[in-house]
Amino acid sequence: MKTVTEFQNKNILVLGIAKSGYAAATLLQKLGANVIVNDGKPLAENVLAAELQAKGMDVVCGGHPLELLERNISLVVKNPGIPYSNPILVAAKEKQIPIVTEVELAYRISEAPFVGITGSNGKTTTTMLTFEMLKEGQKHPVIAGNIGTVACEVAQDAKENEVVVTELSSFQLMGVELFQPKIAAFLNLFEAHLDYHGTKKEYGLAKANIFKNXTENDYSVINADDADVMALSAYSKGQKVLFSTTKEIEDGACIKDNALYFKGEKVVEVGDIVLPGQHNLENILAAMSIAKLLGVSNEAITAVLKRFTGVKHRLEYVTTINNRKFYNDSKATNMLATEKALSAFTQPTVLLAGGLDRGNEFDDLIPYFKNVKAIVTFGQTAPKLVRAAEKAGLDTIESVDTLDEAVVKAYAHSTDGDVILLSPACASWDQFKTFEERGDIFIQAVHKLI
């Protein structure tokens, strides 16, 4: 365990509780900091805040008063979801108070090396694949970040011979100062989270923070097929390891002769991979690159790929009813994810889509509707998806209020041999707390049809 003294007797403001804020506050108190916790939700409605107050922390709820910054604050640890435009963060920046996220805190207290994985899509699948490959290769991985345990809950206990594998969002990466993963993987980039970042350029620069502190002793795993990612990799001083599904990469990972290769050596036959979807080959190449850089054998990688069928809510097979296959892709919170999901199937498909309106149209989906026989829309974006479906010339287009209704309608529009696919192309927050809740409700609704 790493001994950490830098926070002792320092006044540290934890802004926004939720799971990561709760873990950060608890850790900082353990490390001897004077922790002030602030959350916008009233204390009476905030179970986690009440628990932290019971631990003796100074808890302020119901808003973000600027007066908190007058308490000789040394550091602000913010919830990733709170935008930097929030007045208290603007004021903290003006006062030159460092602002970090929980992942930065985790890195500072750990003696274990980190693997960081970011991108617009495929992060969770790649992170899970990496974890499984490292585990199979006896490299003692610990999974943390957006999936698994909150990073700062496990980081201090992680030993030098272990590896902390983290899935990282742009929100988390905006708040890094010293964070220096031994291996940083950047999977892809497309326009997303513009309500938070403003422009695709700013979004990409936030992601590129994963390279911020890399040195020549570190590695950057880069998607050579993504021009934006390649351009942003210029920010890395680490050794670049490229992967591609479209061209041969001599000093990286690629597909050749129906097999996956790393630095010229065949690792696994494509036919041995059970994870469906062409897009998942990108995720596999990235995970394989990380595993090989950390010394995992081809045999261990192959063993994982022969059994790894995917991650819950990511093109997850649910069941078959009357020869109709149901798939839960609730994690598809943007168009690119839905494009890749639709590309994974050649069968006639009934698509369920819709959710939070972030201001974009859905015309980019039109070329991917070639196998879509019907669409059932729901949520705030239903009218926009209907417009895109009409432009695509779909004959069967229907809008409903709830996901339960959408499942019933989708089944009614299906016939023998069809795929019924939930791939919303939108975030879930208009009707659900999380994409996981949305996926679980979809699965429950499907089982009601039996």
From Swiss-Prot:
InterPro entries: Mur-like_cat_sf (IPR036565), Mur_ligase_C (IPR004101), Mur_ligase_C_dom_sf (IPR036615), Mur_ligase_cen (IPR013221), MurD (IPR005762). It is found in: Cytoplasm. Signal peptide: none annotated. Its EC number is 6.3.2.9. Pfam families: Mur_ligase_C, Mur_ligase_M, MurD-like_N. GO terms for cellular component: cytoplasm. PANTHER family: UDP-N-ACETYLMURAMOYLALANINE--D-GLUTAMATE LIGASE (PTHR43692:SF1). This is UDP-N-acetylmuramoylalanine--D-glutamate ligase.
